[in-house]
Amino acid sequence: MKLLTLNTHSLIEPDYEAKREAFVDFIAEEQPEVFALQEVNQTAAAPLLGDVPEGYYPCPDNTVQLKEDNHAAAVARMLEERGVHYDWSWLPAKVGYDKYDEGMAVFSRAPITDAENLLLSKTSDYSNWKTRRALGVCAGDVWYYTVHLGWWKDEEEPFAAQWEKLSQAAGAKQTAFLLGDFNSEADVRGEGYDLILC
């Protein structure tokens, strides 16, 4: 099984269009069973997306509508144009850089049959950049979560508390894979990486 995870930075990434094109070409060639993306943005003030690409599975309790520059929708459409189909879901977590709906997406070759919107941070304030969520999708009998966790030393929204919520939710599933940007350096002992390995 091929799994891939990437923090895309999407709309704020320098040379965004060229990098998106290269990424979609890579996905079309490698065709991982599942890929998970973080910092999947859309401009909050952009017009609503007209035709939603095939395979979209709305995440429960998401009230933010897809906009025409949504990165996940663009990736789905570009894959369609290459004859590659994925089911996909997108969940915004917060306002990023004062102008983006910033969130996560999961793409699956197998049909998505369920999705979960999991609040990981103490705050649920959409305008607070420290708000953290996980997007989980079920494909077959397996759950795949994409996350973008906070930092270990954040006193307001500590990594350890977010990890505890995520591990409890994923642990309740028969089989679950955790993908994402954990904001934890592997060479730093006694912090996030070690906690994940416990």
PLM regions and their residue ranges:
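Active-site regions of metal-assisted phosphoester/phosphodiester hydrolases
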Residues: 1-34, 58-59, 73, 80-81, ...
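Aromatic- and glycine-enriched glycan-recognition loops and surfaces
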Residues: 67-73
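Active-site neighborhood of divalent metal-dependent phosphoester/pyrophosphate hydrolases
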Residues: 11, 39-53, 58-66, 184
